[in-house]
Amino acid sequence: MSHTIRDKQKLKARTSKIQGQVIALKKMLDEPHECAAVLQQIAAIRGAVNGLMREVIKGHLTEHIVHQSDEVRREEDLDVILKVLDSYIK
């Protein structure tokens, strides 16, 4: 996963943002807040996780599918990413 290592700082920044959003949500649940505000925070977390997933998938597709010269390996890598997408979309 060389692409993940190369983009490590960017991915870590995204995970830190998600972590902060989850901490804020936990605090919201401990205090009285409007349901709409809680739902908005959950939607923000979901959007941040989706963005992280998009970046990792994009890197994986570029490095392991597009630039893969070995046809067998390319198909194996494609199967892996399709299984991950199936589990993510459920």
UniProtKB/Swiss-Prot annotation:
GO terms for biological process: negative regulation of DNA-templated transcription. The keyword Cytoplasm applies. One of its GO terms (molecular function) is metal ion binding. It is found in: Cytoplasm. Keywords: Cytoplasm. The keyword Flavoprotein does not apply. GO terms for cellular component: cytoplasm. Repressor of rcnA expression. Acts by binding specifically to the rcnA promoter in the absence of nickel and cobalt. In the presence of one of these metals, it has a weaker affinity for rcnA promoter. Belongs to the FrmR/RcnR family. This is Transcriptional repressor RcnR homolog. It comes from Salmonella choleraesuis (strain SC-B67).
